UniProtKB/Swiss-Prot annotation:
Part of the ABC transporter complex DdpABCDF, which is probably involved in D,D-dipeptide transport. Probably responsible for energy coupling to the transport system. The lineage of its organism: Bacteria, Pseudomonadati, Pseudomonadota, Gammaproteobacteria, Enterobacterales. InterPro entries: AAA+_ATPase (IPR003593), ABC_transp_ATP-bind (IPR050319), ABC_transporter-like_ATP-bd (IPR003439), ABC_transporter-like_CS (IPR017871), Oligopep_ABC_C (IPR013563), P-loop_NTPase (IPR027417). Induction: Induced by RpoS in stationary phase. One of its GO terms (cellular component) is ATP-binding cassette (ABC) transporter complex, substrate-binding subunit-containing. The keyword Iron-sulfur does not apply. Pfam families: ABC_tran (PF00005), oligo_HPY (PF08352). GO terms for molecular function: ATP binding; ATP hydrolysis activity. It is found in: Cell inner membrane. ATP binds at G49, E50, S51, G52, C53, G54, K55, S56. The complex is composed of two ATP-binding proteins (DdpD and DdpF), two transmembrane proteins (DdpB and DdpC) and a solute-binding protein (DdpA). This is Probable D,D-dipeptide transport ATP-binding protein DdpF. The gene is ddpF. Belongs to the ABC transporter superfamily. Gene3D superfamilies: P-loop containing nucleotide triphosphate hydrolases (3.40.50.300).
Length: 308
């Protein structure tokens, strides 16, 4: 059995941005720009980057909500079951359904199981995620933010998925609750043999959970490797700047490492060379050409000729 569950090969996703009077698209938004990626069985792959880099678009692609404009998205196996846990638990739960029906809705859609079977499953999953079974007839508004996210996690588990995409699973929660949810996810992964794709702009969350980390910038992966390597000794200039931007009391940012431009380039007209060229403090001759993802000696994949 292959250890690779999902494979992306040179995937691009474009959205129409402007049309002429004939209805023909004249301008596109380039959300994903040539991603090559393999997701392995049992791992947690962290996806990190600033707002607008394409993280959530990648999540929608993995879930099948979007199709590639170019390239291939391959799922190994005949029936690869995937689920998603969303950023805001309240908006992702039906306010008119009791919790037991919310948790078992994927099972009802797939198999039309009896109410007795679904109630039994809801009670079992509720215990696993830390919700008391006697609360299952309540509506979502009766729960706190952390409890709602536990309900969303239980719903994702109900169809026995192979892969769960976690799109900012703790960003809408209080700090005191975030660690509880992360620890719950780790426990469930061990018990169910799950594979996670964890999407976040919070480097601390990525550091806590991930086996590998992919750093995204303007719809591309610029650095991919072991989480410990990437987060402690970043090789790509963008990764280093991203980590240096985290608040630190006794670690001022070196002047030569300041961004040349603070604004993220637009994604309607892509840069001609390296996508980070206009902002990179190390930009020099050779950076004006497109950079491909190359493998370094330590096994990391980088999109920067200077860091190889």
């Amino acid at each position: 059995m292959s250890d690779t569950l999902l494979t992306l090969r040179d995937v691009h996703i474009n959205f129409p941005a402007r049309k002429n009077w004939l209805g023909k698209t004249t301008e596109h938004v380039h959300a994903i720009n040539g991603i090559d990626l393999q997701i392995r069985r049992g791992e947690t792959l962290g996806i990190v980057g600033e707002s607008g880099c394409g993280k959530s678009t990648l999540a929608q692609l993995l879930m099948g909500m979007l199709q590639p404009s170019h390239g291939q998205y391959i799922r190994s196996g005949s029936q690869r079951i995937m689920q998603m846990v969303f950023q805001d638990p309240l908006s992702s739960l039906n306010p008119r359904l009791p919790v037991w029906r919310i948790i078992t809705e994927p099972l009802w859609i797939a198999k039309r199981s009896s109410e007795q079977q679904r109630r039994a499953l809801a009670e079992e999953l509720a215990v696993q995620v830390g919700i008391r079974p006697e609360y299952l007839d309540r509506l979502p508004h009766a729960f706190s933010g952390g409890q709602r996210q536990r309900i969303a996690i239980a719903r994702a588990l109900s169809s026995q998925p192979d892969v769960i995409v976690l799109d900012e699973p703790t960003s809408a929660l209080d700090i005191s609750v975030q660690a509880q949810i992360l620890n719950l996810l780790v426990t469930l992964q061990e018990n169910h043999g799950l594979t996670y794709v964890l999407i976040s702009h919070n480097v601390s969350v990525i550091r806590h959970m991930s086996d590998r980390v992919a750093v995204m910038y303007l719809g591309q992966i610029v650095e991919l490797g072991d989480a410990q390597q990437v987060l402690t000794a970043p090789a790509h200039p963008y990764t280093r700047l991203l980590l240096d931007s985290l608040p630190a009391i006794d670690k001022p940012l070196e002047e030569e490492w300041a961004l040349r431009k603070t604004d993220l380039p637009g994604n309607r007209t892509l840069p001609q060379g390296c996508f980070f060229y206009e902002r990179c403090p190390l930009a020099t001759h050779g950076c004006e050409v497109r950079q491909s993802l190359a493998i370094r000696e330590d096994g990391r994949e980088l999109r920067c000729w200077r860091a190889l």
